[in-house]
Amino acid sequence: MSASEPLLDAAFLDDFAHRWLQGWNAHDGEAVAALCTEGVEFSDPLLGTVRGRAAVAGWVRSCAQAFPDYRFEEPERPYLSRDAAKAIVPWRMIATNTGPIDPPGFAPTGRSIVVDGVDHWWFGDGLVEHYRADYDAQGLSVQLGLAPAPGSRTQHVLAAAQRLAAKLPRRRRG
């Protein structure tokens, strides 16, 4: 946020969060990207970081491809930081994975998911300048069948295999 920019307030944030949620739930990448600065940095714990409006629009399209029925809910109102430069926005995503997850290229699993998370928005000129999502990436991976459930037989087998592999002598490259 620039030094000359007025501080954000609750009314602005509520309206902004409503437009953000509308864009996502309409699967409209351009609408979401329009709420970001041209040089936005957009980060996700599983998918990494992209930069720029075009990349954000592509991100929304990729999400809609992987989860065509996705919808986001806002279980609580957004929170504004004390200095009014950052917002924390709780959300819940409900979806079914019927398309490829790209990146990284996972095939559809057909599994339904429910993921709770929060968005962190830093503003510049009244738009999102830096975005970071936080959610339980391990829990999402388990729901999708991409990782074993904690305490499951599969997890125990993988742990045993890892212990065996750790005992094997490592070849030196030279």
Question: What are the residue ranges of the model-derived segments?
Answer:
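C-terminal and inter-domain tail/linker signature
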Residues: 1-174
